[in-house]
């Protein structure tokens, strides 16, 4: 259960909310479009699949570690993904009790690719910080070193790493796992709760 979106484009004040604003910005999505893509699609897919899954079936949602940390210029991406995290918990409770269906959510980190380099470079531009700063910040959060073909020790997880996590969550080997968030991040040290939550709670 997965949906994606393009790289960073706008800070909060510039995100188009109406079709008029979207056309003026010469882009192809409003905030509503992004939310329907990233949250609405998995919601409807889960609802359709649940009617056909037997006892022991499983649903794997693909979120992102960035739903739990800052991802500058990507509000239309991370907000619906945060909603997907809550949806996964709710589905696990409801479908597990009524139908014996397991639901888990996978949290990939940055994926080793040219695309993530481009995304992070754009974030550097939006924040007016030194080139490479965003990439280095996230590499510094990882506790596992894995040398890639380029010799870099702190490389990001690969698409294969993410696929392996999904296969495991969908298999009988994870039969006792449901309602959980599983990270594929090379051990990125990202807190489960945001600072804003901790400040707002009594």
PLM features: residue spans?
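Amphipathic alpha-helical dimer-interface segment in Rossmann-like NAD(P)H-dependent oxidoreductases
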Residues: 4, 29, 33-57, 92-97, ...
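Conserved mid-core segment of classical short-chain dehydrogenase/reductases
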Residues: 4-30, 34, 73-76, 117, ...
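Short C-terminal tail/terminal secondary-structure segment
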Residues: 9, 154, 165-168, 178-202
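A glycine/serine/threonine-rich, flexible loop-to-helix segment
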Residues: 13-19, 98, 111-150, 193-202
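Catalytic Tyr-X3-Lys loop
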Residues: 16-43, 60, 84, 153
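Active-site helix of classical SDR
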Residues: 46, 80, 88
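Active-site loop-to-helix junction immediately N-terminal to the catalytic Tyr of the SDR YXXXK motif
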Residues: 70-79, 90
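Short, small/polar-rich loop/turn modules that mediate ligand/substrate recognition or access, typified
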Residues: 97-102, 177-179
């Amino acid at each position: 259960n997965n949906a994606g979106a393009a790289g960073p484009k706008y800070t909060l004040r510039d995100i188009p909310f109406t079709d008029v604003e979207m056309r003026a910005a010469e882009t192809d999505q409003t905030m509503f479009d992004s939310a329907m893509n990233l949250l609405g699609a998995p919601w409807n897919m889960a609802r359709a699949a649940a009617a056909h899954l037997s006892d022991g079936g499983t649903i794997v949602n693909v979120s992102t570690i960035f739903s739990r940390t800052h991802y500058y210029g990507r509000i239309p991406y991370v907000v619906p993904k945060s909603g997907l995290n809550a949806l996964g918990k709710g589905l696990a409770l409801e479908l597990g009790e009524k139908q014996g269906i397991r639901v888990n959510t996978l949290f990939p980190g940055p994926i080793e690719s040219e695309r993530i380099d481009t995304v992070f470079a754009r974030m550097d531009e939006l924040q007016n910080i030194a080139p490479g700063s965003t990439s280095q910040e996230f590499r510094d959060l990882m506790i596992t070193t894995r040398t890639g073909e380029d010799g870099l020790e702190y490389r990001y997880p690969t698409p294969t790493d993410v696929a392996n996590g999904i296969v495991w969550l969908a298999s009988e080997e994870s039969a006792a796992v449901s309602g959980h968030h599983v990270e594929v991040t090379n051990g990125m040290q990202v807190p489960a709760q945001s600072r804003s939550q901790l400040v707002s709670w009594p």
